Amino acid sequence: MSASSSDDFLQLVSGTKIMFGSLPLTHRYGGHQFGSWAGQLGDGRAHLIGIYTNRFGSRWELQLKGSGRTPYSRRGDGRAVLRSSIREFLGSEAMHYLGIPTSRAASLVVSDDNIWRDQFYNGNIKKERGAIVLRVAKSWFRIGSLEILAQSGELDLLRMLLDMVIKEHFPKININDSNKYLAFFSQVVSETAHLIGLWMSVGFAHDYGPFGFMDSYNPDFVPNTSDDEGRYKIGNQANVGMFNLNKLLKALNPLFSPRQKQLAAQILEGYPQQYYKGFVELFKTKLGLLGENEDDDYLIAFLLKLMEDSRADFTMTFRQLSEISEDKLKDLNIPKEFWALQDIAKHKNFSTWIAMYLLRLKGNVGDSDSERRRRMSSVNPRYVLRNWMAESAVQKAEINDFSEVRFLQQVFQHPFLVQTLAERAGYAQHPPTWAEDVKVSCSS
């Protein structure tokens, strides 16, 4: 019997047994919801049960989500439903194998107990199956962990917590440096710009509750039915990042000298440029462009506008550009299996963009068509976790059939490789007609 099927392991990942020497704890954090300060938010249903260091020296914090009430549960029951737990389990793993920094999911345990939820906040309360996810991350601290202390005037605790975070998770920062908090802020700004750029490069709208990968390209894509005004639409993610960093700066300001406050404000002012520069570089890579050209940002914007106008599939447009030869593009000879390119090829300006693109590819010194396609296929996934895939897996899991959950988990371990079974399942084809009806919400 493997360790993962032992009773001790099952009790551990279901939260019914505590590891020897473990002292479970929960984070206290606050935050903003839809732009307004909401006060203390959690952790209302997550327990940190230990820290694990693997054989490579990487340190991981182990956390159970959906494991019951905490001192910060407010009016919640501390539980999580199966549908949202499956989505987080698959979503975080899919992001990891796409090469995007993320928390990971180590296990998913289904409870025998049912819990009450109003999934779409429309008064339709029903029983749903509960679940617990064991998830891991380098750290579970967040901006709200610092905000709550600054908001309540607990500056000594704020300083202590920040020193610990820097010491444990920002080893390049000298803990004795008088500018350590400024260096911390600068690194968080840079990493935030980079992370959101990575999300955009795969068409991902955050977070692991009501998240979504775009089907048709649409900068107004909002996977969350609770977001009536589109605050968190995919095209606004960089702006929300700026908002969050503003709140982090506000939390850190009591620890800064007047000069440090000025420098921190300048660092924040540089965020939009950092983000946009990274965004352009990521999309240049997706298009197989080498070197520098002053018109690259226009070439990218032109393509995205064509995709928006023609409702072209985001993932497969870039993937099929990775697979088609330059000769076929030059002749506008789009085979029927390149269905996403056929959709965008109907646009009256597609031939103009193709001519610009092929001319730009000629500037790839020492490159070849086969090398371009190889390079592009290594960064443009063929499979992403579309909401209809997750919904199909959830519906089967609700009746104790977890085969599709396991299958998707396997598929997303190799998102850039053509997989026979994934092709048969239609994961690289036009989404089914019912996919447009899939809705997700904050309810979990």
Model region roles, listed by residue range:
Residues 84-85, 115-118, 122-196, 202-305:
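ATP-dependent phospho-/nucleotidyl transfer catalytic cores
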Residues 1-30, 34, 228-444:
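Regulatory N- and C-terminal appendages and interdomain linkers associated
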Residues 2-176, 232-233, 241-245, 252, ...:
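Conserved ATP-binding subdomain of kinase catalytic cores across diverse folds
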Residues 46-49, 200-208, 343-347, 364-368:
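Short, mixed-charge, low-aromatic patches
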Residues 68, 78, 214-221, 363, ...:
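N-proximal short alpha-helices
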Residues 77-78, 207, 313, 401:
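Acidic side chains
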